[in-house]
């Protein structure tokens, strides 16, 4: 009976030691994964800053801004005239806005 109890005790201790070693190994892997992630993010940020310093990104942004402005200017002009016509219909109800 004592031999059985000693065997169970020994197996329990070995199992706990194994679980502790696995847990420590998992924490180590998790820490290395997190540090690797932050290193990747930092490297990406450095690359992005280097690209932003270059004229290529600035040229692309300027071209995009100009294209957007060209496309939206007529839309906002029409919206402005429509808004003025709408508001003028409240101010002077006798005058009707020109219909198209």
Curated annotation (Swiss-Prot):
It is found in: Secreted. Its main location: secreted. GO terms for molecular function: apolipoprotein receptor binding; cholesterol binding; cholesterol transfer activity; enzyme binding; heat shock protein binding; high-density lipoprotein particle binding; high-density lipoprotein particle receptor binding; lipase inhibitor activity. Keywords: Antibiotic, Antimicrobial, Cleavage on pair of basic residues, HDL, Lipid transport, Pyrrolidone carboxylic acid, Secreted, Signal, Transport. Gene3D superfamilies: 6.10.250.100. The keyword Signal applies. GO terms for cellular component: chylomicron; spherical high-density lipoprotein particle; very-low-density lipoprotein particle. Residues 1-18 form the signal peptide. The keyword Transport applies. The modification Pyrrolidone carboxylic acid is found at residue 24. GO terms for biological process: cellular response to lipoprotein particle stimulus; cholesterol efflux; cholesterol homeostasis; cholesterol metabolic process; cholesterol transport; defense response to bacterium; diacylglycerol catabolic process; high-density lipoprotein particle assembly. Plasma. Belongs to the apolipoprotein A2 family. May stabilize HDL (high density lipoprotein) structure by its association with lipids, and affect the HDL metabolism. Has antimicrobial activity. Monomer. Interacts with NAXE and NDRG1. This is Apolipoprotein A-II. It comes from Bos taurus.
